[in-house]
């Protein structure tokens, strides 16, 4: 049997100086499965403690009623999915949830708001929330949509650590998934976030009827961001009745693991997070993802409005795999 050796260009220095063409990334996807996982595991061990997992908790602080038409999203006002609209929550309620998350081992508290982008009056409330959560000693992350000029600086001044702004899918597949914004709109906000000095959390979703080449295009687009994102969430589509993608073709589990491995190889210093879709993954599949370089999960029974594995189940799985929550001491 011929073993294919992956040529990893200088382990992709950070910030990004190596251009990853779609063809180059597609070639990684086509590497024999176990060889690909092995190579990704080697890259992982050069930059991270392979026995630790970074735990984040995600809370929806403003739910439903979004004017966007993202085909995967149950929070769009255009679809009938049963999601109950909820205005921006009060500071006290959010802080209480953040305290619970910290007590259960989360090191980062992520907050999501379902809108196209915040208005100036929303930013005033959000900065108050960020300051209160930071006072608990947690890292903070926000996903608030497209930002106007100056907003990223206000969030940074309030103490926000990370801004999540996913590019969703490959540029070539974008219009098949979203019609109310362009791929460049996402890049524009990412540029504002970087300019303000915030860390970037940026990933995408697989299983949206894209081709393997389009999955390669997603990873190439992420890997070519300069600098590369500090955090890369890889989501498996959660199919929700009422959304246009409710009947999307099922993605084979090995293809998802390949995506994790390719993300790890092309972005060696980024945290690669198992995000939405874990509820439908077996323990064995998740273990393979960790082997392939995933080193972060969303921890808690809910991801915005979709179900996530229960914390007890995650603790049991981590114990089986001899994995520990990441801390400053064991990084």
From Swiss-Prot:
Kindly tell me the pathway this chain contributes to: Cofactor biosynthesis; biotin biosynthesis; biotin from 7,8-diaminononanoate: step 2/2
Q: Which residues form the Radical SAM core domain?
A: 51-278
**Keyword line:** 2Fe-2S, 4Fe-4S, Biotin biosynthesis, Iron, Iron-sulfur, Metal-binding, S-adenosyl-L-methionine, Transferase
Residues that coordinate or bind [4Fe-4S] cluster: 66, 70, 73
| Enzyme class per UniProt | transferase
Binding, [2Fe-2S] cluster: 110, 141, 201, 273
Which chemical reaction does it catalyze?
(4R,5S)-dethiobiotin + (sulfur carrier)-SH + 2 reduced [2Fe-2S]-[ferredoxin] + 2 S-adenosyl-L-methionine = (sulfur carrier)-H + biotin + 2 5'-deoxyadenosine + 2 L-methionine + 2 oxidized [2Fe-2S]-[ferredoxin]
Q: Which InterPro entries match?
A: Aldolase_TIM, BATS_dom, Biotin_synth/BioAB, Biotin_synthase, Elp3/MiaA/NifB-like_rSAM, rSAM
Task: Extract the signal peptide range.
Answer: none
Question: Which SUPFAM superfamilies does this one have?
Answer: Radical SAM enzymes (SSF102114)
Which Pfam families does this one have?
Answer: BATS, Radical_SAM
Sample GO molecular function, one term? biotin synthase activity
Q: Which cofactor does it need?
A: [4Fe-4S] cluster; [2Fe-2S] cluster
Report what the protein is called: Biotin synthase
Q: How does it assemble?
A: Homodimer.
Q: Which organism is it from?
A: Histophilus somni (strain 129Pt) (Haemophilus somnus)
Describe its function. Catalyzes the conversion of dethiobiotin (DTB) to biotin by the insertion of a sulfur atom into dethiobiotin via a radical-based mechanism.
One GO BP annotation here? biotin biosynthetic process
User: Which gene does this sequence derive from?
Assistant: bioB
């Amino acid at each position: 049997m011929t073993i294919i050796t992956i040529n990893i260009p200088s382990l992709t220095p950070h910030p990004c100086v190596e251009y990853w063409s779609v063809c180059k990334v597609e070639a990684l996807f086509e590497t024999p499965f176990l060889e690909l996982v092995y190579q990704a595991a080697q890259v992982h061990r050069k930059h991270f403690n392979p026995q630790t997992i970074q735990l984040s908790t995600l809370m929806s602080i403003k739910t439903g009623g979004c004017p966007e038409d993202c085909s995967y999203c149950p929070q769009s006002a255009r679809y009938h999915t049963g999601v109950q609209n909820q205005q921006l929550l009060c500071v006290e309620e959010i802080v209480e949830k953040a305290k619970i998350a910290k007590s259960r081992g989360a090191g980062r508290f992520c907050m999501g708001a379902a809108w196209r982008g915040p208005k100036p009056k929303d930013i005033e409330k959000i900065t108050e929330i960020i300051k209160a959560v930071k006072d608990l000693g947690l890292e903070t992350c926000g996903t608030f949509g497209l930002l106007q000029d100056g907003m990223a600086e206000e969030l940074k001044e309030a103490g926000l650590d990370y801004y999540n702004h996913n590019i969703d899918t490959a540029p070539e597949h974008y219009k098949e998934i979203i019609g109310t914004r362009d791929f460049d709109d996402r890049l524009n906000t990412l540029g504002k976030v970087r300019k303000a000095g915030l860390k970037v959390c940026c990933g995408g979703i697989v299983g949206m009827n894209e081709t393997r080449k389009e999955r390669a295009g997603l990873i190439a687009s992420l890997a070519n961001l300069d600098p590369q994102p500090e955090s890369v969430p890889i989501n498996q589509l959660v199919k929700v009745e009422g959304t246009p993608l409710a009947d999307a073709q099922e993605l084979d589990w090995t293809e998802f693991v390949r995506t994790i491995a390719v993300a790890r190889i092309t972005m060696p210093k980024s945290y690669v997070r198992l995000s939405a879709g874990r509820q439908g993954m077996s323990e064995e599949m998740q273990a393979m993802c960790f082997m392939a370089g995933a080193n972060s999960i969303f921890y808690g029974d809910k991801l915005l409005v979709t179900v996530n594995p229960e914390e007890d189940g995650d603790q049991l799985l981590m114990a089986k795999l001899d994995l520990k929550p990441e801390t400053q001491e064991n990084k």
